[in-house]
């Protein structure tokens, strides 16, 4: 299995740089988003205490007995937030594939607050549905909220980098993400004490749905793979001190297929690398405002690349994608 070296982008250097530096980093970002749709963001400015507190709290939560975690289950199939136990989701289904369910457990939460202007019943019932917050460990809500807010801020900064990478005004995306309907997911891939079913993975091959994903993989963890243009799979190793960023289907659509929403998966541990080891990660799925109309970006249209897509509304688009996996 080949290892893919994800392009590393220094966010602080971009934000603090002069015109030439910003242009150079923007160009490298554009090239990476066209080639793989994956980059690693370093010097991101997220407080390490917030990261450590989130890691520790999520590990404590997943270490609880299953009977305790199930008290915070999603209330019914198709509900977006809460605890989902092992084999409760099949990500490959979102791409039309039929596989056994994924070997992972998750906790999912949505926006921390509901904007005053939101009145759409579908939005309130889906993206702004209440999260069944765990009472154990006691630090859960505080750790989760701090991390979510940090990711929302980081996503806004990355979207400004993306704007310049697409030859747009720095603040082009701001109006689309003023009240994002982003979700946060903590993932635990338990030790594998029994052989998986044929075709069963820790996370089946899929692409993400929104504008971008901010992934924090466990230090020195293995198993994340991305699909190359030739169809082969390449392993992606964590970059110390960095967040892994990948593009979602909505961004591919927004950019008229200029940028890639890359298929990725989490494979099972090899026998030679301790199948009993767990793997954990934290993923923030950034999604524009519920009612944002996503039309092809002007700089991604020319005589050789006419617009391929009709406009879609961000929220209903996300809702249809999510419900295909349940």
PLM feature spans:
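Peripheral, non-catalytic segments flanking oxidoreductase cores
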Residues: 1-326
